Amino acid sequence: MMESAVDSERTMLKREIADLRAALNQKEQCLRELEDSVSFATRSEQEVVGNDLESPGGAVHTKLTNDDIARYSRQLILPDFGVQGQLKLKNSSVLIVGMGGLGCPAAQYLAAAGCGHLGLVDYDEVERSNFHRQILHSEDRCGMSKAESARIALNELNPHCEIHCHSRMLYPHNAMHIIRGYDVVLDCTDNVPTRYLLSDACVMLNKPLVSGSALKMDGQLTVYNYGNGPCYRCIFPVPPPPEAVTNCGDGGVLGAVTGTIGAMQALEAIKVIVGMGDVLAGRLLIFDGSSCVFRNIRIRSKRPNCHMCSAQPLITELINYEMFCGMHATDKNNPTLLFSTDERLSVEEYHRKIQAKPHLLIDVRPTAEFEICQLPEAVNVPLVEILDDSYLKRLGKQLEDKELPVVLLCRRGNDSQIAVQHLRNRFPKHFVRDLIGGLHAWTSNIDPNFPIY
């Protein structure tokens, strides 16, 4: 009896500690944003010059060096490019937002081509799951800022390219300062709020925006705010519902697909800078990696009543894009919170109280993910089968036992809550719980040898 009381108190304390840590993290993030806001608000334009938030400047180059001629000779002999094109590139500055699967190849080709100045924006750090597609990062730079890691690789590729690192997130209060002095901006991000932020800022500052995306085996590419072409809001005046948005962390992506789109973003940026070719404005390039087919379709022209780029815009300053879109401006794990911690199970509780007893453990990840790794007693029932009730054919008899605990898990503890919500509606008298933090928490707190992805 005493042991049971101690276990109960221990569990309660752990929950309180977890809740306090979450609250502390949230407050610290709010504090950082407030400090950034105050810092930027109190600086004048002149004070910003020279620090990491200022875009590059410097003398205008009027001739090529012997090293330039040797290094760029194969593109110098292109009739539409030539010496003048190389000089334009050498005097240009490009801001790449997101040093991931798109940003890495884009930066690599821009640096190799002789772009004079590159700005690299990324708040994140290098981790092993990046390596298959984020080709500028390496094993020995795990934990390093992605912007700094990319700078090291790009300097080795072309020491004549000046690199400015912005190892921070873009917010409405700092975006204009960072973007202002660059000639072209590349959107290599993986989230909707940042796409709106970049588009709005580029319209206000009259900067072309080369926008790419890649997911699974597909990719898309277009150029916004160029010539008479539309902005992002012209095409998407209303953001999609959060549940309709999938990033590569959840949906997966093949590295060669991000490489294809990222390289083409570099190509479009070069065309914009040099003034050559037919820039992909007012058109959308769609790449189907499964069949290796490229399609080029026309998209709508400027929207006369666009809230941002019309003659009489309704939006005249950057807004709260997370609130506007109803989702976080990051592709990091943003936990779903459908239930309080009292209505869920920690992995420690499950391991200590339930795992050794009769129960039904349902893993709701897609089959492809279940095959990567699984707990020995888990039954794979993908979330889609939970939601359409097709799981009843497989598990109906087991679920007739109201005394049998039902535990659901997924990779991070998000989809499992959706499954719990559905099962509780159908089986209101059953004990149905999900594991907080999913398999990632299992690795962190129970079995460090269990693989994570």
Swiss-Prot record:
Pathway entry: tRNA modification; 5-methoxycarbonylmethyl-2-thiouridine-tRNA biosynthesis; Cofactor biosynthesis; molybdopterin biosynthesis
A single Gene Ontology CC term: cytosol
Record: residues binding Zn(2+): 231, 234, 306, 309
A Pfam family recorded for this sequence: ThiF
Gene Ontology molecular functions: ATP binding; metal ion binding; molybdopterin-synthase adenylyltransferase activity; molybdopterin-synthase sulfurtransferase activity; thiosulfate-cyanide sulfurtransferase activity; URM1 activating enzyme activity
Residues annotated with Phosphothreonine modification: 62
CDD domains: RHOD_ThiF (cd01526), ThiF_MoeB_HesA_family (cd00757)
Cofactors required: Zn(2+)
PROSITE patterns reported in the protein's UniProt record: RHODANESE_3
Cofactor details (free text): Binds 1 zinc ion per subunit.
Ligand binding (ATP): 101, 122, 129-133, 146, 190-191
GO biological process, one term: protein urmylation
Listed NCBIfam families: PRK05690.1
UniProt name for this protein: Adenylyltransferase and sulfurtransferase MOCS3
Organism listed in the record: Drosophila sechellia
Record gene name: Uba4
